[in-house]
Amino acid sequence: MSQFYCREDELRKLNKRYAGDKFECIVIYGRRRVGKTALINEFCEDKPTIFFSALNTTGKENLEALSKSIMSFERPDMESAPEFRSYDAALDELTALSKEKRIVFVIDEYPYLAKAKPAISAMLQHIIDHKWTESKMYLILCGSSMSFMESQVLGKESPLYGRRTGQFKIEPLDYKETAVFHPNLSAEDNSLIYGITGGVPHYINKLDVRDSVDEALLDNFFDRSSYLYEEPGNLLKQELREPAIYNAIIKAIAEGASRMNDIKMKVGEENSVVSKYLKTLIDLGIAKKETPITEKPGKKTIYLLADNFFRFWYRFVPINMSAIDSGRIAKIYPHAVKQYLPDYMGLIFEKMCQDYLLYYSDSLPIELSEIGQWWGTDPKKKKQTQIDIVGTPVEGKDYIIGSCKYRNEKIGVDELDLIRDYASVFGKGNNYYYYIFSKGGFTDGLLQAQERGEVRLITLEDLYK
């Protein structure tokens, strides 16, 4: 299936701006493989387009590539295109082309161009202000380095600040959008595909699940010749200078280290070093910082892997590397991988349940402001309490408290008693609405509690309805 799938809303908005026939500067950004270029290609398919994909090389070589892109648009039959003497000359040619005719000019991988030619943002600012605002130019700046795009293109310090007319941060698909790729598979299989690929269309296609997730993993993931097996290493080499330390940090977090001190101990580096590398991983969208909902960042801050694909790879590949290399992984897969999938899916199921409440539930007892996890110390029992879901209200003091269980056994009334206790430890609400999500269903006793209006029960299958 096309990587463009589920991007209809973005395409509609891009086309609406194109129909206006006035200058546009659109910024499109998001992590690698998420489908940015596929979206742009779909948008440009029936439009006059100059598509320039910047190279991770010198300014001179990028000017040569830009010259070819412009000349192949102007004179598609010309075998060898002349090179513009300067970037100013190339931009002037684009100005001339867009005076009377609507033209889409795409700079893909814009951070590469800005690195090779640091003055390019100021040059674009000048030509936008003095020439392009009165033209029919439709400029698209696209990039995968999210920190660069947010600070050096969208940020207040950027020469381009205030010049954009629209921006799109292209996110991975959510769990329900991911399932559209495999409408005939079960809810369990689709949840696993989401947990493995993180909703990245390119990875969904490469995993290529047909009848069995297990079979697809063995053929297209746990195989040395497969694309997905090599992908994390290739991405890190492409983005980072010292992948070894980044590897160690990602592996530490994937194995359960979430606090700075725990990560530092596993990696064997000082806090200052780990902190610097973690910041880069956060900028790339691989890791993320989390704080208990309703609280400010501080001592309770933890680090998690934001990218499910990296999380899955680092959870299961390094520990099974010998079996993969020797071709024995199929023999040990049931007890080396499959039996741990429910545990691996725990955090992912929580995110699915949060997204269900935010985007897909038809009727909620409160209007949600935000949703997330909460953790803190129970002062009576002197131990940590963690609540899978806390939904905060737009106004008032009514909260949603939820529990998420990705396991095969039925959940009973004791889980409702437990989250009631958790709500009292949380202690910020006057009233609480309880939700329990379960892959394996519920006991008769808990179903009766739902009939009495004490709790709302939602199965994995319900998430996909």
Q: Residue spans of the language-model regions?
A:
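A cross-kingdom feature that marks ATP-driven nucleic-acid transaction machinery
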Residues: 293, 302-465
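Phosphate-binding site recognition
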Residues: 1-330, 334
